[in-house]
Structures are given as C-alpha cells and as structure tokens.
C-alpha cells in the first residue's frame, strides 16, 4: 500500500546526493516523537511494520500507472497510530471498494503525527498542534503534485485518475490547515478545482468552518462535491466542543453539520447520520464511515460510493442539500 507521511522517521530525513534523494530505503516510524515534519515522505507499506521510502517521482509515477480509475486519499483522525489503526482502516476501505468494483479505486493513507502518550486530553491538544503544523508540509505536497502533473500528465500521456478525499475527525483540521496554507504560500488567488469529492466525516472543526472568511473556506472551491457527515449523538464531538486550544467552546461540524447552510457554497451537502452512527461504532458513534462488524459496507460508505460512481449527490427532494441518511435512502436510490 502506498502512503504519504510527515511523521518523524527513525532513520531521519531523506539522505541526498547533490539534489537527488537516495531512495529507495527502508524506514520506520518514530512513534515517540509526534513533531510535525515540514518534509513529506513518499512510501510503500510492504507488510505490517515494513516500510520503504520510494521518493516523490517514483510514487507519483507508480500511482499514475496503476490500473485503477480513481484515487482515494484517506486522512485519519485523532490519536490514530499507523499499525493499530490507520493501515487496518485503509485496508478495510480498500476491501470495501474492491467489493463494489474490483480494480476501480486505490486507497492512499495520508499519515500525520498523532501523539501516543500522556492521556487523552493532552493527546488531544498535542494532536491539534500537529494538525496545524502539518498544513504547511501537505501544502508543499500539493505543490509538488501540481508541478509533477504539469510535466508528466501531457496530451500524449495524460493522468486521468480522479482524486477523492476522506478526512475523518481531526483529519479535517489537517485538511483545513493544508488548504489555507496552499492559498497563503502558493496560490493567493485561491484553490483550483482538483478533487472530485471531499468527504468530511465526523469533522472536528467548528461548524462555521466552510463559510466565507472562516479557516475552512478554501475546501469547497477545491472539489466538485463536499459532503459533511454528522451525528448529534457522536460522543467524541460533544467532548471536542469544550476540549479545544484557547478554551473556546464551539459546536463542531461533525456534531451539527454546517451552522448556516445558506452561507456555504452550493456544492456543500449535509448528511445527518444520527439514525445509525452508534450501530456501527457503539457506544461513541464516531467512526461510522466505513463498514459494519460483519465486514459489509455501511450507509456512509454506500453513499460515498454512489457519489464517486456518478459524480453527483443523490438527494430527495432534488433541491435539498440537507439529507437524513438512513436505509430508506439506500432503498430509494437503487
């Protein structure tokens, strides 16, 4: 499995010979160090606990040449470490996509530096800092991708793969920080339309984040569709509302959906998952975006898949941008 990370590696930064990286090389995560590197590492997971840094050019070329139609970037949430959580969840997503259509999608995790000690509250604050610091690193990643695409996706040899993003929980803070850094440092005129769908699941950002003038304002211009999955009984969101840097209590996007739908762009959709989120992730109801305990695709995954397949958001009535997601939706959409 290909992946990208800005976690500190035990082997240190990528060694260079002149301006050329000395890759491939075997690497491993330094899990005791949650500093956010300002460099990103393009890697492959060979098996559990075995990773190879292959470098940006090889990574992007391999991704382009894969016999897949679309790319699914997965940005994980708070307090997730690579092997206990991130890679198994990415493998689950890959398996569910393969069940829908073998060979259609490749899942690529983007791994930022979560903390692994000191208790949940300190971990939460540390992870907030790491997400903000990671924004610059992943903004540089975006620029590298645009530069690579300019020289390697030509009329003679185009890269036609659509790109989708799923950000879960605090991963949405990484997304917000990344896009804000892209505009601040690289593209002052705004984000280009690069992504097919951006799925924001249990988003741990304020519920005004997507409005003009807010820190997440650059997310919706970057995608054809932005889908916000939220649940009022997501217990992690209730705790997050008060456990934030600066002691500012604010309702979360993953708890209520957008505060003012009329203020966000018309490509933003809010999906109420309150009917089933605790069925998939009891009792907290926070990690409900993939499958059930039997390995079947869940409602959110089925909805994401329909959006990926069609490029459109199924809704009833057609003009509605706020949707109650339940089994009735699934039956009516078939």
Placement of each model-derived feature along the sequence:
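"Short basic amphipathic alpha-helical interaction patches in structured regions
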Residues: 84-94
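Gly/Ser/Thr-rich loops at beta-strand to alpha-helix junctions
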Residues: 77-82, 172
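Short beta-strand element of the alpha/beta-hydrolase
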Residues: 69-77
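Residue in the alpha/beta-hydrolase core beta-strand immediately N-terminal to the catalytic nucleophile
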Residues: 164, 168-169, 199
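Lipolytic serine-hydrolase domain surface
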Residues: 1-50, 65, 79-80, 91, ...
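Gly/Ala-rich beta-loop-alpha elbow adjacent to hydrolase catalytic centers
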Residues: 138, 167, 171, 175
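Short beta-strand-to-loop junctions in surface cap/lid or active-site-entrance loops
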Residues: 58-67
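Histidine-centered divalent metal-coordination motifs
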Residues: 76, 168, 286
